[in-house]
Amino acid sequence: MDFFNLNNNNNNNNTTTTTTTTNNNNTNNNNTNNNNNPANNTNNNNSTGHSSNTNNNTNNNNTNTGASGVDDFQNFFDPKPFDQNLDSNNNNSNSNNNDNNNSNTVASSTNFTSPTAVVNNAAPANVTGGKAANFIQNQSPQFNSPYDSNNSNTNLNSLSPQAILAKNSIIDSSNLPLQAQQQLYGGNNNNNSTGIANDNVITPHFITNVQSISQNSSSSTPNTNSNSTPNANQQFLPFNNSASNNGNLTSNQLISNYAASNSMDRSSSASNEFVPNTSDNNNNSNNHNMRNNSNNKTSNNNNVTAVPAATPANTNNSTSNANTVFSERAAMFAALQQKQQQRFQALQQQQQQQQNQQQQNQQPQQQQQQQQNPKFLQSQRQQQQRSILQSLNPALQEKISTELNNKQYELFMKSLIENCKKRNMPLQSIPEIGNRKINLFYLYMLVQKFGGADQVTRTQQWSMVAQRLQISDYQQLESIYFRILLPYERHMISQEGIKETQAKRIFLQQFLQELLKKVQQQQQAAALANANNNINSASSAPTPAAPGASVPATAAPGTEAGIVPVSANTPKSLNSNININVNNNNIGQQQVKKPRKQRVKKKTKKELELERKEREDFQKRQQKLLEDQQRQQKLLLETKLRQQYEIELKKLPKVYKRSIVRNYKPLINRLKHYNGYDINYISKIGEKIDSNKPIFLFAPELGAINLHALSMSLQSKNLGEINTALNTLLVTSADSNLKISLVKYPELLDSLAILGMNLLSNLSQNVVPYHRNTSDYYYEDAGSNQYYVTQHDKMVDKIFEKVNNNATLTPNDSNDEKVTILVDSLTGNQLPTPTPTEMEPDLDTECFISMQSTSPAVKQWDLLPEPIRFLPNQFPLKIHRTPYLTSLKKIKDEIDDPFTKINTRGAEDPKVLINDQLSTISMILRNISFSDNNSRIMSRNFYLKRFISDLLWLVLIHPENFTCNRKILNFKKDLVIVLSNISHLLEIASSIDCLLILILVISFGQPKLNPMASSSSFGSESLTFNEFQLQWGKYQTFGVDILAKLFSLEKPNLNYFKSILLNKNTGNNLYDRNSNNNHKDKKLLRRLLNLYNDNNKNNNNRHNLLNDVVSFLFSAIPLQQVLSQSADPSLLIDQFSPVISQSLTSILVIVQKILPLSNEVFEISENNSDSNSNNNGNKDSSFNFNKNLPFVWLSSEENIGSGLLKLSEIILNINNSTSKNTLLQQQNYSKVLLPSINISCVQLIKCLVEKSICFENCLNNDPEILKKIASIPNLFPTDLEIFQLFTNPSVDIQIINQYQLLYNLKNDILTNLE
């Protein structure tokens, strides 16, 4: 009998089976095993089964396909490992609760050898052809199962039936549950079978079937095809009955191919009827041993390869000995088990050898790939690290990222500190902005993200960088970056920086690998600890067991979870306990009393499912850990091999290959020495000098200050003394607690002004001060020239010289002198001589002066230098009247210019040194001018006036002598503040100074832009300045204050202003006659006025300066701002009231005292022609205007007359309001200031109207001047307003008088028009 050949020569086997079922849990297990053997014949077996199932019916469909073509043993053992993803028949169970249902299933199988089952007759059955059992199903894609596949069981390693047999797993009956033992010993009247969770268990049912086969095989049948023993064509295919109920078969049924062909032809009509079973309503439960089943949730195991069919009552059964057959089968199973183990060990050895060979073959290939493509290895490592990081918990990921960030910050700060040390700028502390420390690493990375410092500066994104870092002062942040981080950024771009970056990257990668290793080791330790805890908890849990049967509590260490250990010895007493009665029609059944079932608490489906999921997760985790360990080992091996390869490669001799030169880069040797000097060392010395430069002390740290000593230092020619004195005075004058009194030390002001004049003279002539050549000094022996005070001293010296020469006189010595002695003629005695009187020699003064002048050791010294405007190189070519806002724009452009010279130091350029000293002097004068006592002395000081005049000339006429625009604007600010403080007592020295002051004041206004003209002024056609805005600054108000104060002093200031504004000849001026340089001043003044008016060729614009001054004063009055602020204009008036008052006063002075026809009586005759003729005859000879400027001012687009009238009404309303909450009414000075402003407004309107009429009468241009004046809107008050004003008792009488005069003028104009 051949057990390994599965060939079947039967052509058609048609079986009809009818069975009776009880109220039990029935399971239909449909498995199809296709063994593609070319030697097999195709058999078509169709069987039809009718069954009624009243409980859960489960359809389990599995397909196991084994490849043939190898030896017989390999047909039994399939070494292919289990892959759950490849199992196409892993279907879930479908529970259908059907009460008293008759289900008919028809299944067709292709290429399937259907054995004939030999069954102990539990019920009569008829065998017919064309029908098969209800659980045969071909799981091919062309044929679908009639049942819904919904099985949740996992296929246990997807073993084929041959492999199940090859494993030879036999279980002891003592390990079976109680119900299974009852079925084992209770005979064949029970239609229920137990479900065992083990795939490789041979049940006692199988042994009983083996005995029945041996008995049936010995009996003879009338059919010619029946044989007493199985031949080679009769296949015996045992299988594991793992389902709880297979097609309602009894426990002693067996799958076999052993059947006679005549048995298929014996069918009767009674085969379709159901025969009741004696053990009806026998409810048996399936006991599942879940400890030994780790992969299935239910007890249905889908490893059935054939379908048992009920044998009809007329089956030919033989009466051979069952014990002999069983012993043969047991011996065969033992042999198969030994062969299987040996084969499995051999296969394992072969697989290990193949794996070792593959690894050895892959190592050199991997080395080559690593050498050829290092970038790929690097990217692969990064991907591995990224995948490992993603698999970690978020908390671990955050912790690892924090460690990496800290390490990266540490490396950055070390590199930055080292770079600062190399540049001799050690980073002592982290910089702060607003008591907040700056994170240099974040700042550097953010700037690099924007493209670098140059790109951020080019695109002006420093404010955005500061906003990202939440810092308000971006300019300070920019300076910090340029001072500390910009050299580091340039260092990182160099070759050394690139190498340093690569080393940092390698270090960070190694650091990340070490972190990942530590984390993986911790996870492995935690996983092993959790696994041990799970195993201990599982072993301590109770498992259901039948009475008298002992189940092991824990699995053996060598066995897998869910596999029952196989008993090596089959019990011999098993045959004695089985009583089988084989009859042709009926089979006797032995009734065994059932013991009481022990109540065991079953686990719910949820608990079982949770346990299964936990086990699967644990297995997956272990598998991942093993894979990670293998990867790390491979990486370590690869690195070691690569290092060894690199070492060996370096040992080999270098081979140079000729190649085409591409992208040739010549070698560059950096010059460290220039003419033998180390440039780096010299730069370090310079940096040390700058860092050690002393910072000037503050005012409290200076101690006692001697102003007289400071004035003497200013007069010296020593640069250090001068700078120290200037710095001390600047710090002292800027301190509000200290006051410099010029009353006690007036020489201090003289020293400052004289030093300033000398510096301005040197600056204008490009003379470098404080630099003397050795040729300027004259050396002479101190004893060579002796100067005698008296003649007696000289004579005494000669006597001593003769004594020193031993009193020997030479006879012809010209130096000898004859001494005359008076004697008495009678006696001859010497007469007594009177004591000689010492007399001073009379020295010639001219000779002394000539001697001193010719002496090289004595220099001529003048107290004051010549005025700058009279120097030969100071001829005026242009007046630089740059507006204030334009100056600010120029300063900004100058700062943004990369080639600017604003950072040049005085030690580098002598011109910068002079500019700094002049700026210090102007600031000192500005600070000390705020004192009243000092302002009186300053306004009368001749040296200060001269210094101001020279400084104004250079700033306005020749500003190119200064180094930058910022210095020029600072000089203008200092001058306008100083003049504002001293102008109420200042007497202007010359007309040129007066003109320069006017140009200085006008330069702080904002002129209108004329697109038709090249200049910013319209000329005398309209007002040339825009109304002053609050956000423009306060320097325009200082200009208005200067003009108002200078106009208050009539002689000589007002006369100078009148001659300049009216563009008259200043030769007859008394004050100019007193000047020594009158002729030069006249020429310069005419030249300057022509430059300002641009009237070299014609006289059309002779009064541009007058128009600009009046326009500037009108622009200081905020008419539009007050009128637009209708809610509460009192605040604006309170802020601007002093400026408004000064502007109105200055305009009234110009209109009443400077404009001509001021003393004439204004009369309007009824006949305009007569008046015109009279005016022509009485025309003033000094009138040289070609335009009616007062009418131009009234009729301008700003509508000055209407604005002044509305301003007067608003001030009246403020004064007459009943509420006293306004700020103006609470102040005392407003009681006088506001009425004066009101009077000035009305008076100015009246004067402008009168002057307009007078100018027009003198010009004889337009006879309809009265109509034009009357047509100006809102120029005169209405009758109602005049009536309300006159009836208001709270209005000041002076205001009423001015309104009355204006009203009378209105009536006169209207009368003449009528």
Curated annotation (Swiss-Prot):
Annotated Polar residues bias: 236-250
A Pfam family per the record: ARID
Keyword Zinc-finger appears in the UniProt entry: yes
Low complexity composition-biased segments: 1-65, 88-112, 213-235, 581-592
An annotated GO cellular component: SWI/SNF complex
Keywords: Activator, Amyloid, DNA-binding, Metal-binding, Nucleus, Prion, Transcription, Transcription regulation, Zinc, Zinc-finger
GO biological process, one term: positive regulation of transcription by RNA polymerase II
Zn-finger (C4-type) residues: 1241-1258
Domain ARID span(s) in chain numbering: 406-493
Compositional bias per record (Basic and acidic residues), positions renumbered to this chain: 606-617
Coiled-coil spans in chain: none
Signal peptide from the UniProt entry: none
Stretch list, region Disordered: 1-112, 213-250, 262-321, 355-384, 581-617
Biased composition (Basic residues): 593-605
PANTHER family (UniProt xref): HAT-TRICK, ISOFORM D, RBP-RELATED
Function comment: Involved in transcriptional activation. Component of the SWI/SNF complex, an ATP-dependent chromatin remodeling complex, which is required for the positive and negative regulation of gene expression of a large number of genes. It changes chromatin structure by altering DNA-histone contacts within a nucleosome, leading eventually to a change in nucleosome position, thus facilitating or repressing binding of gene-specific transcription factors.
Other comments on record: [SWI+] is the prion form of SWI1. [SWI+] is the result of a conformational change of the cellular SWI1 protein that becomes self-propagating and infectious. This conformational change generates a form of SWI1 that assembles into amyloid fibrils. [SWI+]-aggregates sequester soluble SWI1, resulting in reduced growth on carbon sources other than glucose, reminiscent of a partial loss of function of the SWI/SNF chromatin-remodeling complex. [SWI+] can be cured by GdnHCl and by deletion of the molecular chaperone HSP104, which is required for [SWI+] propagation. Present with 92 molecules/cell in log phase SD medium.
The protein's assembly and partners: Component of the SWI/SNF global transcription activator complex. The 1.14 MDa SWI/SNF complex is composed of 11 different subunits: one copy each of SWI1, SNF2/SWI2, SNF5, SNF12/SWP73, ARP7/SWP61, ARP9/SWP59; two copies each of SWI3, SNF6, SNF11, SWP82; and three copies of TAF14/SWP29.
Family: Belongs to the SWI1 family.
Domain notes: The prion domain (PrD) is a Gln/Asn (Q/N)-rich domain, which is unstructured in its native, soluble form, and which forms a parallel in-register beta-sheet in its amyloid form. The first 37 residues of this domain are sufficient for aggregation, propagation, and transmission of the [SWI+] prion.
Protein's name according to its UniProt entry: SWI/SNF chromatin-remodeling complex subunit SWI1
Organism: Saccharomyces cerevisiae (strain ATCC 204508 / S288c)
Upper classification of the organism: Eukaryota, Fungi, Dikarya, Ascomycota, Saccharomycotina
Gene, per the UniProt record: SWI1
